[in-house]
């Protein structure tokens, strides 16, 4: 009976002791992140660094509308194809939209020299001033300026480019011409012209009254002399002749001089360019909408302040960096492992080793206490706030460093530059791969550091409590301490805020420890006596059983016993 009372006393003492546990917050979040060592770690809080959505529309860029070329190409627009007449009045834009394979380009067949370079130049232009460089009515009094072609028809009538003049002979003559323009616009001026290549000598004589024509174009940075190539060619757009198109950029203060005795397609309008580094040319079939955005891709607009996107590598405006990643999520909270709460008489709760606490909602780290006055959770606001500040600063720093928003337009190559285009693609792919690797590695490393940081903070909080309590309490696992003395709410609060008075409770704790140690010793002595008696009794039972079996076997002759003296 005495043994039973001692065991019950020991159990009662352990069950009803005051306790305090250190743990961390948990919630119902299903966010997962990757670290250097683990994949799909469930965490309480995280931030997404990768934008993967767009609106599927073409939008204004910071309130400025794009220039939609419609069914016209850049060549058709800048030369003044009659079918692109509606674009003539457009002089400013946020970016240029060209459809894939537009119908209206160069209406009169021929080669457009350095066309891809011209597109590249225009991709950085946000506005221009279209002005008459050589007025039609006064610049060419000795030449006919009404040359048209059925291949450039408009509304069923033969026409020609709005920005060029096809000069032909007048009154049976084509006098030598010399015309110059001095750039006084204080901007670069884009000048375009052409050279006509007739299909036969008869056509050459009829138009220009000479067989040995030339065209010369000279400026400080450009000098070239063209000779018409008279030859029969396959018909294109019902034309056997060709017009080759040329352009140059005239610096402020520079002069361009045109000399010719035939075959000149003269400039009528030129363009004073204003550069805008946020502009660009994109190929897209996306519809225009009444929306405003900071970033435009061929697939649609992106409205995001995130540092990375995987929507499209070609972007216009202030855009996140393109990476090939499918997921870039940075942890800001803790590992989310809600504990399985085992409830005894006083609802004992597992601590931070086995899992977090969903009941603690006002902080990341904190305490759960239990005494005669009840139980409850309390966050450690100081350590939580320090952690929040540190992680917030880190996330902001990462986003700020990686969030270099910019325009990334595609490079232009002609059909004869396939090797260069392929090399450029390989280089671009290499850069994208490097950016993707750097972004993913950065997130993996920072996630690992953040989770280790949280683990360290919980451990530091545990050590803080342990150093205060010393031998006034014992560690019982799961981040918990069991007091050797009564600890009311005021006492619990002193442990949490670091003002626990160790000497005040040391005597009570000492007596409690001695009492518990005495109970353990007496209980151990009783158990030893019981063990001895149990061993002796079992041995006697075994001997009696063996004797009875031997006697029975001897009596029925199964066992013979001989005693020799």
Curated annotation (Swiss-Prot):
A Pfam family it matches: Hemagglutinin
Places the protein is found: Virion membrane; Host apical cell membrane
Molecular-function annotations in GO: host cell surface receptor binding
Cytoplasmic side: 550-565
Chief location of this protein within or outside the cell: virion
S-palmitoyl cysteine: lipidated positions: 554, 561, 564
Site (Cleavage) location in chain: 343-344
Membrane-topology annotation of the record: Single-pass type I membrane protein
Keyword Membrane found: yes
Record's keyword terms, sorted: Clathrin- and caveolin-independent endocytosis of virus by host, Clathrin-mediated endocytosis of virus by host, Disulfide bond, Fusion of virus membrane with host endosomal membrane, Fusion of virus membrane with host membrane, Glycoprotein, Hemagglutinin, Host cell membrane, Host membrane, Host-virus interaction, Lipoprotein, Membrane, Palmitate, Signal, Transmembrane, Transmembrane helix, Viral attachment to host cell, Viral envelope protein, Viral penetration into host cytoplasm, Virion, Virus endocytosis by host, Virus entry into host cell
Residues in the Extracellular compartment per record: 18-528
Transmembrane segments: 529-549
A Gene Ontology biological process term: viral budding from plasma membrane
Disulfide-bonded cysteines: 21-480, 59-291, 72-84, 107-152, 295-319, 487-491
The protein's assembly and partners: Homotrimer of disulfide-linked HA1-HA2. Interacts with human CACNA1C.
Family: Belongs to the influenza viruses hemagglutinin family.
Function: Binds to sialic acid-containing receptors on the cell surface, bringing about the attachment of the virus particle to the cell. This attachment induces virion internalization either through clathrin-dependent endocytosis or through clathrin- and caveolin-independent pathway. Plays a major role in the determination of host range restriction and virulence. Class I viral fusion protein. Responsible for penetration of the virus into the cell cytoplasm by mediating the fusion of the membrane of the endocytosed virus particle with the endosomal membrane.
Other comment: Major glycoprotein, comprises over 80% of the envelope proteins present in virus particle. The extent of infection into host organism is determined by HA. Influenza viruses bud from the apical surface of polarized epithelial cells (e.g. bronchial epithelial cells) into lumen of lungs and are therefore usually pneumotropic. The reason is that HA is cleaved by tryptase clara which is restricted to lungs. However, HAs of H5 and H7 pantropic avian viruses subtypes can be cleaved by furin and subtilisin-type enzymes, allowing the virus to grow in other organs than lungs.
Protein name (record): Hemagglutinin
Organism: Influenza A virus (strain A/Russia:St.Petersburg/8/2006 H1N1)
Gene (UniProt): HA
């Amino acid at each position: 009976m005495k043994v039973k009372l001692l065991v019950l006393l020991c159990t009662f003492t352990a069950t009803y002791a005051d306790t305090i546990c250190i743990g961390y917050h948990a919630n119902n979040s299903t966010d997962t992140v990757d670290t250097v060592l683990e994949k799909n770690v469930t965490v309480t809080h995280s931030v997404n660094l990768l934008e993967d959505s767009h609106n599927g529309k073409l939008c204004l860029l910071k309130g400025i509308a794009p220039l939609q070329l419609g069914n016209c190409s850049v060549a058709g627009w800048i030369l003044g194809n009659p079918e692109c007449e509606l674009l003539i009045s457009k002089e400013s834009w946020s970016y240029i939209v060209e459809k894939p394979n537009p119908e209206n380009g160069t209406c009169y067949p021929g080669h457009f020299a350095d066309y891809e370079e011209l597109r590249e130049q225009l991709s950085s232009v946000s506005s221009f001033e279209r002005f008459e460089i050589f007025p039609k009515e006064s610049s060419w009094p000795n030449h006919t300026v009404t040359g048209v072609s059925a291949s450039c028809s408009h509304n069923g009538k033969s026409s020609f480019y709005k920005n060029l003049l096809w000069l032909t002979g007048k009154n049976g003559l084509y006098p030598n011409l010399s015309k110059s323009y001095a750039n006084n616009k204080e901007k670069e001026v884009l000048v375009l012209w052409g050279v006509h290549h007739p299909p036969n000598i008869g056509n050459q004589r009829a138009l220009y009254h000479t067989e040995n024509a030339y065209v010369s174009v000279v400026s400080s940075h450009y000098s070239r002399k063209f000779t018409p190539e008279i030859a029969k060619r396959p018909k294109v757009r019902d034309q056997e002749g060709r017009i080759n198109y040329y352009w140059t950029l005239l610096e402020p203060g520079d002069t361009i001089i045109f000399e010719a005795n035939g075959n000149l397609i003269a400039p009528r309008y030129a363009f004073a360019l204003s550069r805008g580094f946020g502009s660009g040319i994109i190929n897209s079939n996306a519809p225009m909408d009444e929306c405003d955005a900071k970033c435009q891709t061929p697939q649609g607009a992106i409205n995001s302040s995130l540092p990375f996107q995987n929507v499209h590598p070609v972007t216009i405006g202030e855009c996140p960096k393109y990476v090939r990643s499918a997921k870039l999520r940075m942890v800001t909270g803790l590992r989310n492992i809600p504990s399985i709460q085992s409830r005894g008489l006083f609802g004992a709760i597992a601590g931070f080793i086995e899992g977090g606490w969903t009941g603690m909602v006002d902080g990341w780290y904190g305490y759960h206490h239990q005494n005669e006055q009840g139980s409850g959770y309390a966050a450690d606001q100081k350590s939580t706030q320090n952690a929040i500040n540190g992680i917030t600063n880190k996330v902001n720093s990462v986003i700020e460093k990686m969030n270099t928003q910019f325009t990334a337009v595609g490079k232009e190559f002609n059909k004869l530059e396939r090797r260069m285009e392929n090399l450029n693609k390989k280089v671009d792919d290499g850069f994208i791969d490097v950016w993707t690797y750097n972004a993913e590695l950065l997130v993996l490393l920072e996630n690992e550091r953040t989770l280790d940081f949280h683990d360290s903070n919980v451990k530091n909080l545990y050590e803080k409590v342990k150093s205060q309590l010393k031998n006034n309490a014992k560690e019982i696992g799961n981040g918990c301490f069991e007091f050797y003395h009564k600890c009311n709410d005021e006492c619990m609060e002193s442990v949490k805020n670091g003002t626990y008075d160790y000497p005040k409770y040391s005597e009570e704790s000492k007596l409690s420890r001695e009492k518990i140690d005495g109970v353990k010793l007496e209980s151990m002595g009783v158990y030893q006596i019981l063990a001895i008696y149990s061993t002796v009794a079992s041995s006697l039972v075994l001997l009696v059983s063996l004797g009875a079996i031997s006697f029975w076997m001897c009596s029925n002759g199964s066992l013979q016993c001989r005693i020799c003296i």
